[in-house]
A protein has these predicted regions:
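Jelly-roll (double-stranded beta-helix
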Residues: 1-250
Length: 250
């Protein structure tokens, strides 16, 4: 049995930080949250005016943030003394836990800045753990070559390859690329909430087409299976997480 689509979300154009322009898909008016995910943004522009002001110091508490850079550079600093530089293909994994103040500021580069940020809720018993931070360089993220494309494994396991991300709850996070008219099957635990976000091309699931900039939410049982269209290569983010089923204060 394959998972079916239960909703497709367009997201909204907005800004955050000191005016960084982005598309908010989870955490916006059409999808407040998808347990355990509190927020999912795509940020990106080839115009420095859209992102150069960055995200000055601001507080977080009680969840994890996962920032995945496709292109560009952002420098991280936080109140625990951590500092790191996000660059092409790398990931910043921060556990806010009991509380941390951090900043994410872009460094000037030629061309496009593009990436994603995901907020992962922590269960009540873990909300007051010590803050922690790790940079995952691009060359430490395994890339699984398949006949019809490739899968970057940021967290979770695909084809017996496990990603370097170490969440405190069950989470799968892949960056998938499929050639034209190809398909992929991904085993996922039952009762986990799952979505794919298309950032280039078009995904197909049965009679549904998921366009660039759209997020599709799937049912909670079965195999995740989707295809690319005949007209373009598909690039998408695949995320699935163990539900927490606890109230969230927003």
């Amino acid at each position: 049995m394959n998972r079916s689509i239960i909703n497709i979300i367009d997201g909204v154009q907005t800004s955050d930080g000191a005016g960084v322009k982005l598309r908010r898909i989870i955490g916006g008016p059409d999808l407040n949250m998808l347990d355990p995910f509190l927020l999912f943004d795509e940020f990106g522009s080839d115009n420095p005016d859209d992102y150069i002001a960055g995200f000055p110091p601001h507080p977080h508490r009680g969840f994890e943030t996962i920032t995945y850079m496709l292109n560009g550079k952002f420098r991280h600093k936080d109140s625990a003394g951590n500092e790191g530089l996000l660059s092409d293909g790398s990931v910043q994994w921060m556990t806010a836990g009991s509380g941390v103040i951090h900043s994410e500021m872009p460094e000037k580069t030629d061309g496009l800045v593009r990436g994603f940020q995901l907020w992962l809720n922590l269960p009540k018993k873990l909300k007051m753990i010590d803050p922690s931070y790790s940079d995952i360089p691009s060359d430490k993220i395994p890339e699984v070559d398949i006949d019809n494309g490739r899968v970057r494994v940021i967290s979770g396991t695909y084809n017996n390859i496990t990603g370097p991300g170490k969440p405190h709850t069950g989470v799968l996070y892949f960056d998938v690329e499929l050639n034209q008219s190809e398909s992929i099957e991904i085993p996922i635990d039952d009762f986990w909430n799952t979505f794919i976000y298309v950032y280039s091309g078009q995904a197909c699931v049965g009679d549904h087409n998921i366009l660039q900039g759209q997020l599709a939410i799937f049912s909670q049982k079965g195999l995740l299976r989707f295809s690319s269209s005949a007209s373009s290569v598909l690039q998408c983010i695949v995320v699935s997480g163990e539900t927490i089923n606890e109230p969230v204060a927003r």
